[in-house]
């Protein structure tokens, strides 16, 4: 799992070169590695016959024999070549060969040469002197004053080891004694000196490192970075291989402006499931600008993710993340969350699943990072039941969904509630070669038991609320294929779709309180974001607390073009709109009602005009706001997995944001352009650069430049980054007051012949806005 060792702090200059090598890096590295010649023999090696060839032989039976001149001794997979060999025999079991002068030893795992050696022909043991060795079929070589080799262990005295190829001494490890464990694929070394270009840079009385693919405990290579906010940072990870099915990484980090942070991560795979438990902790954050209201300077993160299948049909899922404060992900880079998420999720779900029904109990809570007077509700417990039966009614498919949920809020102004919901659905699907027609009837039956908030300022509530809403839906789809080609070489299809939905109006303003409408309606409902595909959703709101009235027709269609020779889709274009025969509303407030007869126009398109090129575009025009509400487009050139260029643009109007989020702090449109380049220049040099700029604010959002230099036995990464960060406490917080964190880092990675990655994909994952692909045609 951890065969790569990351990041020594060094200053380096990346030297770019543009010529391309004849073979990729892995092939180049393996060209410098010896390979076993001939057919590998399996079985007990000491039972194999011994073959001795020489120019001359003096035999003194049955005690000894002396061979001279191009002597070759072969037994199974091992061979010895020397100028002079004396073989001594003591009975049938003990036979030893003594080599004088220069020799060469090889088997299917190692090659060695030197002066003077002894070999036990009755076992798999060899004693070598003044030897140089190289692993067979993988990177790894070294020297030793003396060594004892057997079938599962090599003991070397005054030895060196490196994974670099011959004539490359970029790094090496020296020690008084080294034991290489062959089956376990690791080496132990005592009084270890780590050298770079022959210069000692690190000492340890004891060290372990891999000589294969298996995981081993030990210190990983430290990493460095410097940030304008954190100052100088140094991390020293320690890897602990606890058992074959569990391991851990413990990383202490020192920030010159904050203090010490400890970050343990435990991974497991057991009969009780698989998952990860992690944490990050600073006992006292010394950063001057961090001034919490309660003067508590402890900063921490807790994370637990667990998946489990047990007995027959039972599943358990846990995803729990909690941080000490709202600024945590703005101040610290973490694998377990981001400031752009807006919240941390704490949830679990235990379910029992059968072919025609399932039952689950769950709980969920959100820790928001925005400054909100009233936060979202937590739900515990939530009990869900689903039942499916396609034989209950002839020609129909019956579904039943039922839920019981308890809602509570941290604010004393907010009510508490139990919600009981039943939702039977009956579908009558019809399909033939011309298309499909689906008739659906559904009933939403919900009852609430509400308790007024404990504060005197809390709104009065109806204690018992019952809401029953029937629904009818008709959905028609077909696929039409054009007889003639609009564009030569491309076949065309058109997929029209028409859907009618009817639900009567029910005033739902007495469900929940209006004080938390900045995050939700009722207890867990929010206005859904819309695109072409969401036009055909039954509902405008998520959750169950707001089910808007509906008397509407949604019409749309998708046009597709296919290459007539390969049948591969190269272009599609979708357009649709909803037409309201009567206003859709959830209460009597005008802002929660559709006043126009038609909804937003929604368009979406994808074009793969070359196997290396992709384009995606989406556009929405809001007829209620009489403006473009959302738009985005992206163009990507990707000739290979490690070479890509992507340009993007995103737009969201402030009115659309206010309508959905209701907490648009700056009251500003979002107009953001972005460019990302990830490119493997050669087998050794790769880089990634990205820049995102907000046109509306006329200021950058994030910029990154990262360069990777790769060799057979090490790689180095140098990066610089500048990104928006949280407003320092007490500082001005207006649209013109933006704050940035500037970061510089150098990473080293020792390679032991198991990884030849260019590093492009790893670099693309970094940043506040990571690289994504959103293309509908691959």
Swiss-Prot record:
Keyword presence, Ion transport: no
Example GO BP: lipopolysaccharide transport
One GO CC term, this protein: transporter complex
InterPro entries from the UniProt entry: LipoPS_assembly_LptD, LptD, LptD_C, OstA-like_N
Ranges in a coiled coil: none
Assigned keywords, A-Z: Cell outer membrane, Membrane, Signal
Signal peptide span: 1-23
Protein origin, superkingdom: Bacteria
Record keyword Membrane present: yes
A Pfam family assignment: LptD
Subcellular location per the Swiss-Prot or TrEMBL entry: Cell outer membrane
Function: Together with LptE, is involved in the assembly of lipopolysaccharide (LPS) at the surface of the outer membrane.
Subunit structure: Component of the lipopolysaccharide transport and assembly complex. Interacts with LptE and LptA.
PANTHER family from the UniProt entry: LPS-ASSEMBLY PROTEIN, LPS-ASSEMBLY PROTEIN LPTD
Annotated NCBIfam families: PRK03761.1
Entry's family note: Belongs to the LptD family.
Protein name in UniProt: LPS-assembly protein LptD
Taxonomic source organism: Actinobacillus pleuropneumoniae serotype 7 (strain AP76)
Gene from which the chain derives: lptD
């Amino acid at each position: 799992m951890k065969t790569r060792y990351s990041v020594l702090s060094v200053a380096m200059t990346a030297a770019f070169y543009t010529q391309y090598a004849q073979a990729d890096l892995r092939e180049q590295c393996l060209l410098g590695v010896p390979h076993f010649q001939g057919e590998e023999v399996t079985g007990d090696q000491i039972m194999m016959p011994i073959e001795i060839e020489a120019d001359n032989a003096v035999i003194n039976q049955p005690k000894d024999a002396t061979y001279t001149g191009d002597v070759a001794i072969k037994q199974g997979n091992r061979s010895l070549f020397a100028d002079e060999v004396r073989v001594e025999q003591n009975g049938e079991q003990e036979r030893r060969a003594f080599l004088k002068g220069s020799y060469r030893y090889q088997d299917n795992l190692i090659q060695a040469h030197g002066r003077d050696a002894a070999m036990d022909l009755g076992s798999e043991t060899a004693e070598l002197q003044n030897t140089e060795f190289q692993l067979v079929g993988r990177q790894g070589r070294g020297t030793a004053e003396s060594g004892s080799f057997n079938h599962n262990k090599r003991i070397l005295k005054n030895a060196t080891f490196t994974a670099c190829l011959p004539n490359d001494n970029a790094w090496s490890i020296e020690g008084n004694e080294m034991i290489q464990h062959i089956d376990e694929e690791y080496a132990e070394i005592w009084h270890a000196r780590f050298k770079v270009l022959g210069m000692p840079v690190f000492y340890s009385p004891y060290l372990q490192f891999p000589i294969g693919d298996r995981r081993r405990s030990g210190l990983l290579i430290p990493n460095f970075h410097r940030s304008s906010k954190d100052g100088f940072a140094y991390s020293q990870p320690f890897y602990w291989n606890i058992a074959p099915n569990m391991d851990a990484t413990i990383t202490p980090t020192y920030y010159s402006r904050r203090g010490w942070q400890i970050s343990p991560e435990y991974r497991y795979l057991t009969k009780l499931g698989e998952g990860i438990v992690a944490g990050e902790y600073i006992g006292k954050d010394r950063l001057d600008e961090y001034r919490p209201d309660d003067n508590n300077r402890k900063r921490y993160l807790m994370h637990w993710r667990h998946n489990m299948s047990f007995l027959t049909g039972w599943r358990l899922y846990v995803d729990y993340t909690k941080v000490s404060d709202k600024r945590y992900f703005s101040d610290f880079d973490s694998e377990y969350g981001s400031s752009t998420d807006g919240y941390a999720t704490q949830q679990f779900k235990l379910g029992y699943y059968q072919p025609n029904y399932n039952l689950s109990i769950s709980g969920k809570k959100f820790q928001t990072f925005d400054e909100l007077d009233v936060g979202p509700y937590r739900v515990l417990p939530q009990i869900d039941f689903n039942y499916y039966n396609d034989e209950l009614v002839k020609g129909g498919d019956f579904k039943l969904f039922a839920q019981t949920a308890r809602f509570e809020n941290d604010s004393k102004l907010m009510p508490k509630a139990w919600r009981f919901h039943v939702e039977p659905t009956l579908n009558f699907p019809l399909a033939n070669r011309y298309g499909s027609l689906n008739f659906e009837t559904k009933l939403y039956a919900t009852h609430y038991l509400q308790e007024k908030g404990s504060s005197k300022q809390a709104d009065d509530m109806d204690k018992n609320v019952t809401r029953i809403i029937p629904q009818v839906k008709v959905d028609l789809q077909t696929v039409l294929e054009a007889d003639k080609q609009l564009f030569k070489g491309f076949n065309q299809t058109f997929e029209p779709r028409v859907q009618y939905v009817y639900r009567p109006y029910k005033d739902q303003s007495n469900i929940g309180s209006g004080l938390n409408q900045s995050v939700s309606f009722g207890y867990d409902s929010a206005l859904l974001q819309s695109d072409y595909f969401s036009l055909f959703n039954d509902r405008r709101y998520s959750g169950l607390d707001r089910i808007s009235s509906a008397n509407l027709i949604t019409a749309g269609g998708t046009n597709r073009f296919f290459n007539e020779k390969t049948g591969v889709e190269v272009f599609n274009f979708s357009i649709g709109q909803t037409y309201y025969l009567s206003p859709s509303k959830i209460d009597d407030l005008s802002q929660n009602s559709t006043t126009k007869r038609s909804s937003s126009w929604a368009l979406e398109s994808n074009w793969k005009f070359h196997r290396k090129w992709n384009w995606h575009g989406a556009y929405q025009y809001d007829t209620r706001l009489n403006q473009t509400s959302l738009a985005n487009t992206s163009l990507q050139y990707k000739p290979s997995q490690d070479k890509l260029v992507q340009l993007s643009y995103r737009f969201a109007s402030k009115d659309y944001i206010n309508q959905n989020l209701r907490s648009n702090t700056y009251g500003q449109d979002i107009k953001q352009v972005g460019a990302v380049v990830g490119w493997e220049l050669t087998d050794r040099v790769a880089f990634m650069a990205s820049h995102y700029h907000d046109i509306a604010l006329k200021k950058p959002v994030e910029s990154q430049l990262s360069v990777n230099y790769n060799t057979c036995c090490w790689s180095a990464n140098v990066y610089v980054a500048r990104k928006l960060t949280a407003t320092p406490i007490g500082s001005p917080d207006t649209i013109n007051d933006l704050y940035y964190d500037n970061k510089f880092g150098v990473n080293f990675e020792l390679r032991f012949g198991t990884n030849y990655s260019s590093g492009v994909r790893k670099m693309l994952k970094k940043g506040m806005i990571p690289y994504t692909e959103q293309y509908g045609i691959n």
